[in-house]
Amino acid sequence: MINFDRKKYPIYASFLNQLAKDLTKFYNSKLNRTFKVSNKLKGKGYDPVTTSDRAFEKFIRSRIKKKFPTHQVIGEEYGSTNSKSDYTWVIDPIDGTRSYVIGNPTWSNLISLNFKGIPILGLANFPVLKKYYLNYSDKLAYVVSQGKKKKLSVNKKATFKNVKVSGAFHGWLSLNKQKKIPKIL
């Protein structure tokens, strides 16, 4: 068990709540118009990165640095900062860059706060959908959609009868293996 001071949850949760709102405003004011796409992979393969990925990450990093200047930050586009802090922010500025590029609204900004390597808070923000999810370790999770907050919980009576699975495997899971997914469930 880690010795994270749980009294600090409200500080970080408040920051992430505001950051989700700010990221949505940032997207709507600047990033939903035009962007450029390039390939991060040299040679074989294709891993797209957009100017929006980079802009989101810079925006997130600036907010973290302003509020928590001693914390370490690791981001997909700009790597890590050097810090001896027990706190590390992990950023995927656009999870689902391929969806972003084609205009599918299911991409998100993913941000995790880790304490001594253990995730303690996580944010999944969907700017186009005006929705975000926030979880506090394994204790509490909620969704904010269209400004309304709803606590999430595990359904103790869940069955797999009505489960739907969606994924984008982009070459790392063969079509043959993808066909076996329904059998697993």
Language-model features: where?
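An extended, acidic
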Residues: 153-185
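N-terminal subdomain of lithium-sensitive/metallo-dependent phosphomonoesterases centered on the IMPase/IPPase/PAP
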Residues: 1-94
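Short amphipathic beta-strand/extended segments with alternating polar/hydrophobic composition
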Residues: 134-136, 149-158
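Short helix-loop capping/hinge motifs at secondary-structure junctions, enriched
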Residues: 140-151, 172-174
